[in-house]
A protein has these predicted regions:
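Conserved glycine-rich cofactor-binding loop
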Residues: 20-21
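Alpha-helical segment proximal to the catalytic Tyr-Lys
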Residues: 135, 179-180, 237
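Active-site helix of classical SDR
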Residues: 130, 166, 174
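Substrate-binding pocket helix/loop in short-chain dehydrogenase/reductase
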Residues: 99-116, 209
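Residue(s) in the substrate-gating loop at a strand-loop-helix junction
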Residues: 149
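Short, small/polar-rich loop/turn modules that mediate ligand/substrate recognition or access, typified
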Residues: 182, 187, 239-241
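Short C-terminal tail/terminal secondary-structure segment
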Residues: 2-5, 154, 207, 229, ...
Length: 253
């Protein structure tokens, strides 16, 4: 049985950053299956490995670390929005730099240029998109979803301080935007994934799950996508300012 959002006056429009793999990939598939039109943004050209309809013509190639490219991309995006309405913005793109051996980068060994790049992609691009699209979101009674991380709330063995602090800041930004944008009819929430099964898992993940996750398993990208879809649906019409953990109870340990 389909939900109200799946059988109403579709297509609604979703803009999602970071769609080529993992959580973003699963989220596009979930919304596409519900009849939404999905516009994707990434630094790379559209990948033919992305199996959703009209994906190539609904893709914008943009470096989210470059304010000039964001400004230019916003102009192009606005031309593509029917009736100047955007129903959902999902800020999923994120980078987590590692040392050459794959270990986490600590504060001392992370050059300030890397910090700036991480914050540009993980935080500042979110601000730029929210500022640039609030009118289109307001016109649709839309919603913003920010993808944070459990690393934004606790020291994580695989995520370094640049990534962790950018995600903590994104959680704070979610609350600020929820407060500012509520009078505009825009809801703003976040999802905070824990250990999620992806194509590349850090060594030691299984041991971390066993010791730190009460449910004793990895989450799936589909489970994260379902929560994102819920937050963009009428079922969550009175939910704003929330940061929902999707971590099998990891945050309680």
């Amino acid at each position: 049985m389909h939900t109200v959002d799946e059988i109403s006056e579709c297509p609604k429009t979703l803009l999602l950053t970071g769609a080529s793999r993992g959580i973003g990939h699963a989220t596009v598939k979930r919304f596409s299956a519900a009849g939404w039109r999905v516009i994707t943004i990434s630094r790379q050209p559209f990948s033919e490995k992305c199996p959703w309809a009209h994906g190539k013509e609904n893709h914008l190639q943009m470096d989210l670390a470059d304010p000039g490219q964001i400004e230019q991309g916003l102009r192009e995006l606005k031309r593509r929005l029917p009736e100047s309405k955007l129903h959902a913005l999902v800020n999923n793109a994120g980078i987590s730099p590692k040392m050459p051996d794959g270990s986490r980068m600590d504060t001392i060994h992370t050059d300030l240029k890397i910090w700036w790049h991480v914050f540009s992609v993980n935080l500042f691009s979110t601000i730029a998109l929210a500022r640039g699209l609030f009118e289109e979101l307001s016109a649709a009674g839309g919603t913003i979803i920010n993808v944070t991380s459990i690393a934004g709330k606790r020291v994580h063995p695989f995520a370094g301080p640049a990534y962790a602090t950018s995600k903590a800041a994104l959680g704070a930004l979610t609350r600020e935007l929820a407060n500012e944008f509520a009078p505009l009819g825009i809801r703003v929430n976040a999802v905070s994934p824990g250990e999620v099964a992806t194509s590349i898992l850090s060594p030691g993940t299984e041991a971390l799950v066993e010791s730190s996750v009460p449910m004793k398993r990895l989450g799936t990208i589909g489970e994260v996508a379902e929560v994102i879809f819920f937050l963009c649906s009428e079922a969550a019409s009175y939910v704003t300012g929330a940061e929902i953990p999707i971590d099998g109870g990891q945050q309680v340990r």
